[in-house]
Curated annotation (Swiss-Prot):
This is Probable histone H2A.5. GO terms for biological process: heterochromatin formation. Gene3D superfamilies: Histone, subunit A. It is found in: Nucleus; Chromosome. It holds the Pfam family Histone_H2A_C. One of its GO terms (cellular component) is nucleus. A motif (SPKK motif 2) lies at residues 155-158. Residues 1-29, 136-159 are annotated as: Disordered. GO terms for molecular function: DNA binding; protein heterodimerization activity; structural constituent of chromatin. Residues 11-29, 148-159 have a biased composition (Basic residues). CDD domains: HFD_H2A. Belongs to the histone H2A family. It comes from Oryza sativa subsp. japonica.
Amino acid sequence: MDAAGAGAGGKLKKGAAGRKAGGPRKKAVSRSVKAGLQFPVGRIGRYLKKGRYAQRIGTGAPVYLAAVLEYLAAEVLELAGNAARDNKKNRIIPRHVLLAIRNDEELGKLLAGVTIAHGGVLPNINPVLLPKKTAEKAAAAGKEAKSPKKAAGKSPKKA
């Protein structure tokens, strides 16, 4: 029998699980790190089980869901950052998040029924309420004809 106590009568220390008793313990690696994600795979898996969405939850389900949530968060944050930069701000506020979501076709469709607190509304003026463009052009043309400089410049030559 060897000295580690793995003989017929000897037992391994509790929690040794496949390594020699008293050997160096490997550092634990989270499933988020293994998947290369920032979002917590373990916590999402716990929520899936606790929520009773199904009797059984596969091992890949929380990893996939964490990846999808991380992608959506990154997409919204990137667009909100662009909106903040467009408004010459360094900090993202709820208004920037709303502008980012509502101006993006796919995110707008996904989050159509979502209300964002302190987000405000999209700037929108009904075209009927805007002044007529033809009236503006006619008024501008009329002003040009009555301008004294223009009239002086187009005087006929004396013969």
